[in-house]
Design a protein with these regions (language model features):
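Conserved Rossmann-like nucleotide-cofactor binding loop
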Residues: 31, 56, 90
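Glycine-rich dinucleotide-binding loop and its adjacent helix/turn
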Residues: 1-41, 70-73
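Cofactor-binding loop segments of dinucleotide-utilizing enzymes, especially the Rossmann-like FAD-
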Residues: 28, 51-53, 127, 180
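A conserved FAD-binding loop/helix module that cradles the flavin
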Residues: 128-179
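Active-site-lining helix/loop region of Rossmann-like oxidoreductase modules
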Residues: 60-63, 82-86, 221
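Rossmann-like dinucleotide-binding cores of NAD(P)H-dependent redox enzymes
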Residues: 22, 34-75
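C-terminal auxiliary extensions adjacent to catalytic cores
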Residues: 179-227
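FAD-site-proximal beta/loop scaffold in flavoenzymes
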Residues: 1-17, 78-145
Length: 227
């Protein structure tokens, strides 16, 4: 999916002109906001419109979006080009057919061991799941932090051992990069508080992101052979 999405964006590079119909991002969450900033950084001339509920977005961020020449709209009553949806996820149809427990946002309900409530042997984490006793919004922060517990519990489940419980923190610190006028900057969001934009926040996020990506780099000679 990522490669197809990346090719889709690359193919739009030739349309970086004010004469081209605007590119539209749909969504009011941080994903839609960060995608809008990233595309503005990539396309300096093309018109970009964010179709969103402005009341759901902090005023500091709204001002920054406008300063980055990202137009905020609440309808699509204009000629536009391509669209990207950043509207969150929903449960697939087979979930409803199997009568599995999920919340109003379409996320699987699990116990603290990360197992589905009424389906033995199946684990769920990340944006597709929520712990019944510790409900948190979908966020990459929780999705990353739960991984160690998930791996350990998969192993323990196979070996017939007692599973480990996981309790997410109450709030997660979220950092959003924005389109820089001169130096790169970011907002930091914690609960209802928004800090920045600041270069120091961007530096902090950049360091975290780079260290995270390094974990996925394979050393030379470690690539699996085809066939």
């Amino acid at each position: 999916p990522f490669l197809k999405a990346y090719e889709f964006i690359k193919n739009e590079d030739i349309h970086d002109s004010q004469k081209t119909p605007p590119f539209v991002i749909i969504g009011s969450g941080l994903a839609a906001i960060e995608v809008s900033y990233a595309l503005r950084k990539r396309w300096r001339n093309r018109r970009i419109k964010l179709f969103c509920h402005q009341k759901k977005i902090n005023n500091k961020i709204l001002k920054s979006l406008r300063n980055s020449h990202i137009e905020l709209v609440d309808n699509l009553d204009f000629d536009y080009g391509k669209i990207i949806l950043c509207t969150g996820n929903t449960s697939p149809l087979w979930v409803e057919r199997k009568l599995l427990d999920f919340d109003s946002n379409g996320r699987f309900i699990t116990n603290q061991n990360l197992k589905l409530k009424n389906c033995s042997g199946i684990f769920a984490t990340g944006d597709c799941a929520v712990i019944e006793s510790a409900k948190r919004p979908a966020s990459g922060i929780f999705a990353v932090k739960v991984l160690n517990t998930l791996v350990k519990n998969l192993k323990k489940d196979i070996e017939g051992q007692s599973l480990k419980k996981w309790s997410p923190q109450r709030f997660g610190l979220q950092i959003v990069n924005l389109f820089p006028a001169r130096n790169p900057m970011s907002f930091a969001i914690y609960n209802d508080f928004v800090f920045g934009p600041s270069f120091l926040i961007w530096f902090f996020k950049n360091r975290i992101d780079r260290n995270f990506i390094k974990q996925f780099h394979l050393k030379k000679g470690k690539m699996p052979k085809k066939g």
